Structures are given as C-alpha cells and as structure tokens.
Regions:
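Catalytic cores of large soluble enzymes that bind and process phosphate-bearing ligands
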Residues: 33, 59-61, 73, 77, ...
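Short beta-strand and beta-hairpin "edge-sheet" elements
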Residues: 73-103
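Juxtamembrane "anchor/assembly" segments of surface/extracellular structural proteins
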Residues: 1-66, 102-110, 126, 142-144
Length: 166
C-alpha cells in the first residue's frame, strides 16, 4: 500500500513563481495522444460584492504569458506542463468567486490558419522537422528512409497535416 505524503504544486508564470497568497483550488492537466496538451487552474479569487478580484486584476495570468506547472511530493517537484495562458475568466457563485485559467501547449500555434505548401524530394521526417521548426517548437523526429517525390499540404493547418503524415 502507498504511504500518505504531502503533495506539492508550484506554478511559474513568465519564469516567476506565483505568490503563496494565491489560493489554488485545483489543477487539471490533460495530455492525450494526437491532441494539444492543456491545463486548467482554479483559484479562489476575491469578493463579488466588493468587486475586488486580486488575482484576476494582477498581471500574473495575462493571456499569452508562458506558464509552467510542477507537481510532486515534499517540494520535490517535476514539470508536468509547459505552455501559454490562452484565457482567464471569473466565475461568480453565491458563496464564492473563482478565477479559471486555461492553458495550452505552445503547439496550439500550429492549429491556427489553413496553409498550402508543396514539398519536393524530401523525406517525411525532413518535412516534419521543417514544419515544427517553422513554428518555433523543439523537435525530436525519428528519421524516415523513403524519399518522396512530392507532398502537398492543401488547405490544412500544420497540426492536422502532421497528424496525417505521422
């Protein structure tokens, strides 16, 4: 049987740890095959009756800012998510108000816009490295052996095209 232990969480935005005064209610990290990883953070934030929302009004969770979530035991934390903040919203209930922070992996940029490209005399691995590199992401692509005479990316996002080729 597992022994009980103290779970710890650390959240960095823009490389800076968030203040300890922020009351984190929950963290959800989703990593699924063929999907963009995501994370959702819930914080207790402010009082609706006074219209004060300390965390939401701060610059800690501005959309577009980089975020890193680390989880572990007894402050021995490991990174479980790195990405960007895509939205934050306040949900007001009768008894409390919560700040909801939605995050996505940086690969979310590959889903924006449909593109048309022509690749000639390249391997699938070379095409993938080129597309991933053009999006400013780190890449680790296993080399393929077959040279393809021509490959066309027609009216599809880089993400969808890579999923079809992988």
């Amino acid at each position: 049987p597992a022994t009980p232990d103290v779970c710890t969480v650390s959240i960095l935005t823009g490389g800076t740890q968030i203040p300890g005064s922020y009351h984190l209610l929950s963290v959800t990290v989703n990593k699924e095959l063929n999907r963009i990883p995501s994370a959702t953070l819930y914080f207790y934030d402010g009082e609706a009756s006074r219209s004060t929302f300390e965390i939401s009004n701060s610059e800690t969770f501005i959309p577009g800012k980089e975020i890193e979530i680390l989880l572990g035991y007894r402050s021995q934390n490991d990174t479980v998510f790195k990405g960007v903040i895509v939205s934050h919203s306040v949900r007001v209930r009768r008894n409390s108000s919560n700040l909801i922070v939605e995050c996505r992996d940086k690969a979310i940029g590959m889903t924006l816009g449909r593109k048309n490209k022509y690749f000639a005399d390249q391997k699938d691995s070379e095409i993938m490295e080129q597309i991933i590199g053009n999006n400013g992401l780190q890449k680790e692509v296993e080399a393929t052996t077959t040279d393809l005479k021509e490959v066309v990316q027609f009216d599809s996002s880089d993400w969808d095209f890579l999923l079809c080729r992988a």
